[in-house]
Amino acid sequence: VTNPHPYFAPGGNPDGTRGGGPEHAVPGDQDTARAPLAMAHRGFSLDGLENSMAAFRAAVDLGFRHLETDVHTTADGVLVLFHDKTLDRVTQERGRIADLPAATVARARIGGTEPIPLFEELIAAFPDVRLNIDVKDWNSVDALASAIERHALHDRVLVASFSDRRRRAVLRQLSRPAAGSAGTVSNAVFVLLGPVLPATLMGFVARRALQGVHALQVPVRYGAVTVVTPGFVRRAHRHGLQVHVWTVNKPAEMHRLLDLGVDGIVTDRADLLKTVLTERGTWA
């Protein structure tokens, strides 16, 4: 994909290359095979310790340089890394994070053992790692934007959300652009209208609906609809968009998607994705 945001620049992958295939090479990169982005979904833990420092460390120790994570904000404005809006599913505590002070959230233990990390902890622990951040609630919009500005993370983060409005609200507050991925509505526009609109009209629609978007992050299927098809990948690349697929945990499916030319894979099985990329010669 031509002229990607610095988030996708060399150095983000274990072998220092970027997403996409040779046919999508950036000028000056013709001599370098461009590796897909390998993204560890909530880190890597076979024991259910998702979004814990232990899980992030395990992924980084495997060689991952892109971590996917989620942010919520406590009642007193502290940005934490956690997927659910409540603590109930994976900790011994109960309640909505947005209603609880940081001191209460700090007592929670993921899987009974691991504390919920602060956003600040993750960026300090792994200063060279890039973060795919899913903004889970409106309370986190200002908190995340402030953290990106305070730590100059514009080139290290990709801001994602199922809500296009939340993503845009974060990006609007930044002094320079951070990478972004499409939300549910923008993805639906591209998936549903892409095959039926003439290319020129689709280009106009894409520019309007996908302003500030650098990647389409999608599941292989949504209900009965197959999202990731050869045509979908071609259309995305034609409009300068990367395709990242979540959450892919089977090696055969990883190979199939990589053969289609997707630019990134989000996985719970960082170990298996590393093996697949090693087999394909795109892991250092």
Name the predicted role of every residue range.
Residues 1-284:
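Phosphate-group recognition and catalysis centered on beta-loop-alpha active-site segments
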